[in-house]
Amino acid sequence: MNIKSEFFRVDFIIGARRLSNYFWATVVFLGSLGFFIVGVSSYLQKNIVFFLSASDILFTPQGIVMCFYGIAGLFLSFYLWFTIFLDIGSGYNEFDKKKGIISIFRWGYPGQNRRIKLSFPIKDVQAIKLEVKEVLPARRMIYIKIKGQQDIPLNRIAENITLREMEDKAADLARFLKVSIEGL
C-alpha cells in the first residue's frame, strides 16, 4: 500500500515479514529440532519421539554431530524468527514537496541504530538511478542520487520485480520529483 497525492508520496517497504522467511524459519526450526532429538535419543538409547528412530545411531560420533547440527540449526532458526518478529528492513520512503524533504526510514536491529532515518532536501536530488545485474539471482535496484552522498537504495535487494515494473516505479518517482533517470 502506497500513499500518493500531488505534493506528498509514501512508498512502504516490506522487511523480513515475507512468506519465504516464514517458510524457511519453520523448515530450519523443524529440521534442527529433529536432528537434536535424534542426537539426544542416541545418547539415552531410547526413542524420545516415535517417528524419529535413533536405535541405529551410535552416540559417538554420529549422535554428537547430530546434537551439534541441531543446536546450530536452532540458533539459526531463532535468529530468523527474531528478524521476522522485529521486521528488520521494513520502513518507508517519504517524499514531501511542501516541506521540500525526502525521508527514508528503515527498522534495524536493537540497539543504537534500531531506527534508521535519513532526511535530505528535495533540491539535492540529482536523479533516479536504475541498476540491473542479470546474474542468478537477478538484481534490480532503484537508487536515488543525492549531491555529496552515495546512492541510496529505495527498494529491497531481494525484491523480485520485473524490468517493466522497475522502470514504471522509477519513471513515476522521477516524474513526481521532476528529475531524470539514469542507468539501463
Swiss-Prot record:
One of the GO biological process terms: photosynthesis
Keywords from the UniProt entry: Chloroplast, Membrane, Photosynthesis, Plastid, Thylakoid, Transmembrane, Transmembrane helix
Question: Would the keyword Magnesium be found if you checked this record's keyword annotation?
Answer: no
Q: Name one Pfam family in it.
A: Ycf4
Got a GO cellular component term for this one? chloroplast thylakoid membrane
Superkingdom of origin: Eukaryota
Note the topology in the membrane. Answer: Multi-pass membrane protein
Compartment annotation? Plastid, Chloroplast thylakoid membrane
Q: What does this protein do?
A: Seems to be required for the assembly of the photosystem I complex.
Task: Kindly provide the name given to this protein in its UniProt entry.
Answer: Photosystem I assembly protein Ycf4
Write down the species: Chaetosphaeridium globosum (Charophycean green alga)
